[in-house]
Every structure is written in C-alpha cells, then in structure tokens.
Amino acid sequence: MKTYLVGGSVRDEILGLPVTDHDYVVVGVSPEEMVHLGFRPVGKDFPVFLHPQSQEQYALARTERKVSRGYKGFEVYASPEVTLQEDLARRDLTINAIAKDEYGNIIDPFGGIADLEAGVLRHIGPAFTEDPVRVLRTARFAARFGFHIAPETLALMNEMVHNGEVDALVSERVWQEIARGLMERHPSRMFYALRDCGALTRIMPEVDALFGVPQPPQHHPEIDTGVHVMMVIDYAASRNYSLQVRFAALTHDLGKGTTPPEEWPRHIGHEARSVRLVQGLCERINPPNEMRNLALLVARYHGDVHRAAELRPVTIANLLQGVDAYRKPERFEEFLQACACDFHGRPGYATRPYPQADRLREAFQAARSVDAGAIAKEMARNVSDPSRLPVAINTRVSETRIAEIRNRLGSLA
C-alpha cells in the first residue's frame, strides 16, 4: 500500500500558493482493506474514503472509460493493480497530474512542472475530450492562474464544442463552473477562453452576443460592449465583491446584444431587454435566487443610478422602493456596488469618483429615518374610514420620505 498527495494541492504547493485541501491516492489496496484500516467509505461513484483521524479524502487509484455522452458517462475501474501513472493519466491537465509520495519525492510523468513554469494549460491525452466539464475547468484555470491554453488543447476544446459534448452539460455543472470562474482574480480570462473555443455561444449566448457591438465612444472608450463587460467583472473581482455582485456585473448589459445594428452605437431601451434576457439565462443555468434577483435589479435600474444627480426626490424614492431597499438594505448596497462596477469598468475610469452611489446612499439613509410605524398609528387615529387607511398610510409615508430625501440632498448641494 502506497499513498500519494495528488492534484491541486501539489500544483498549488509548487506555485507557492496556499494549500487548503489535500487529496490522496492510494495504490495497491482493496476497499475491504481500507475499511479494515479504519477508513470510512463515502464515495458514491468510485471508492473514496475518509481518514479515521484527519477526515481527509483518500481515493483508490482508478481508471475511467467513456461509455456515454456527458460528464457522467464514465465506467470506473478501481483495483489494487491500478498504478499511480494510470490514475494520473485519467486527469485533465498536466499541471493537475503531479503527485508527491510520503518522502516528498515528486512524480511528474506528463511534464506538469514544466508547464507550470511556462504558464501553459495542456491536456494529458486524447481522453481529455471525454468529459465536457473540462472545457469549463480549463477556461477557469486560465482565469485563476493567468496561464495560456496550449494551441493543441484549445483545438480539442473547439472539437468538443462542435461535436455537441458541451451541449450535454447539465445546468448545475455549468453554473458551478461559471460561479467559480467569476470568483477568480481575473474572471474575464475564463470568458475569453470560452469564446476562443466557441463554447461561450453555446453556454451563455447572451454574453457572447455582446462582442462586436459598439457603444458611444464618448462614454465608452473601449467601444466594444463585450470588452466593457469583461472590464466590469474584472473590476468587481479587484474589489473582492461577492458572487452576487459579479454575476450582476456580467449580465447588466445583455440587452445591448439585441440592439438592431441600424441603431448602433446607441442602445435605447436596453435595460428592459436586459431584464428579459437575464430571466431567460437564469431559467437555463439556474443560479440561486439571490443571484437572479440582484442581476434583475441591476439590469433594470443601473441607468437610473448613473443619472442619480439628475433625479428628482420623488424619482429617487420610487427607485428605493423598486429595489426593495427598505426590506433588503444589504442587497441595496450590493446593487450600488454592481452599478459602480459598470461605471469603473472602462479605460481610464477605474480610479474616478462615482458620487452617484454616495448620493443614493444618503437618500436612502434619509428615507429610512422616517418612522412608518408612528405614521401608521397617527393615521389610524385620524382616518375615519378603515377602508381608506392603507392607502392613506402609504401616501403619508411616501410623502414624508420624499421630503426627507429633498432636505438631505439639498443640504449636500
């Protein structure tokens, strides 16, 4: 029985990155022997065990054989006869097929260290094409490490797209990889990689459609809407914003991809079109509701936020009500963050001030200082017709909030 540290933990250690999870492969032992040694079996699709003390995962060396389409279409074979090299050969990229034994010796049969040093993402062999998730994973690693994809690997990814393998991915896996990619340091690199191999138009055609669509150069020096959106998500990443903010940043301008070319570079009404496209995208890839809800709000209202200095107090009050700021103040802050990312995601705008967000924060603080409960009690004493009471309360609360917003913003002028 021999135990090896494998995969991402070895890779990250070589790169000098923090190692949080340890994955082990065990060679020369049966499942029964693992149980006898005190390991607890937890694997559903292949033999994986938890160490009796550390609770870390130990997997028996295995091989895999493609038997049907999709990422689950594999037949797994695990036995004491499977070698370490055979186990490493089933992995996706050379940088993920490095092992270390208990004495610290490195086993690198596929040149992963050389590719780490060169900053290259390279597939191990033709079996790479058997798992469509590898298209997304490879693109995500490009975002994580800033590595470039080897031309021959990119060609295989393109082949997988054209063969329809990517179309077999279930929504849960697509969202899982997109979410992880958005949380990398440079998420745009994932989407550029997906576009390079043709996968973006299959997975997120709404985003792919943004590339090549011009915007007014006086507002968008980058001109290309797709490039703008990539700058927006990278800015969100540079600020360490949440996944909700990053997803909203990715989807806020989807409607510009449907603007008729004869109307370019203007995009009148793109906010409403963006809302419909965000709804369709979310129905397809099924992100959590908090992602969907924030993305819809940003798509609908980001133009209003950019014009905050021009908005009347009543319009600001309606905006606060529309984004449900009073009941969800934390989400309102994320809403403003996403709108700020849209502003900063342009050449030369990263360090410019964005007073619109602060203006709306001030307006919100003024509006939320209104005691709606006290107003309700007062109105209950003064309104004789109970059927008119709800409308009367809402009207008085709204009028008071508008007055507070007017006073607060007037004092800032």
UniProtKB/Swiss-Prot annotation:
GO terms for molecular function: ATP binding; CCA tRNA nucleotidyltransferase activity; cyclic-nucleotide phosphodiesterase activity; magnesium ion binding; phosphatase activity; tRNA binding. Its EC number is 2.7.7.72, 3.1.3.-, 3.1.4.-. It holds the Pfam family PolyA_pol_RNAbd. ATP binds at G8, R11, R91, R137, R140. It comes from the Bacteria. Mg(2+) binds at D21, D23. The keyword Nucleotidyltransferase applies. Keywords: ATP-binding, Hydrolase, Magnesium, Metal-binding, Multifunctional enzyme, Nickel, Nucleotide-binding, Nucleotidyltransferase, RNA repair, RNA-binding, Transferase, tRNA processing. CTP binds at G8, R11, R91, R137, R140. Magnesium is required for nucleotidyltransferase activity. Residues 225-326 form the HD domain. GO terms for biological process: RNA repair; tRNA 3'-terminal CCA addition. Its cofactor is Mg(2+); Ni(2+). It catalyses: a tRNA precursor + 2 CTP + ATP = a tRNA with a 3' CCA end + 3 diphosphate; a tRNA with a 3' CCA end + 2 CTP + ATP = a tRNA with a 3' CCACCA end + 3 diphosphate. Belongs to the tRNA nucleotidyltransferase/poly(A) polymerase family. Bacterial CCA-adding enzyme type 1 subfamily. Comprises two domains: an N-terminal domain containing the nucleotidyltransferase activity and a C-terminal HD domain associated with both phosphodiesterase and phosphatase activities. PANTHER family: MULTIFUNCTIONAL CCA PROTEIN. Catalyzes the addition and repair of the essential 3'-terminal CCA sequence in tRNAs without using a nucleic acid template. Adds these three nucleotides in the order of C, C, and A to the tRNA nucleotide-73, using CTP and ATP as substrates and producing inorganic pyrophosphate. tRNA 3'-terminal CCA addition is required both for tRNA processing and repair. Also involved in tRNA surveillance by mediating tandem CCA addition to generate a CCACCA at the 3' terminus of unstable tRNAs. While stable tRNAs receive only 3'-terminal CCA, unstable tRNAs are marked with CCACCA and rapidly degraded. Monomer. Can also form homodimers and oligomers. HAMAP family: CCA_bact_type1 (MF_01261), CCA_bact_type2 (MF_01262). A single active site specifically recognizes both ATP and CTP and is responsible for their addition. This is Multifunctional CCA protein. It comes from Nitrosospira multiformis (strain ATCC 25196 / NCIMB 11849 / C 71).
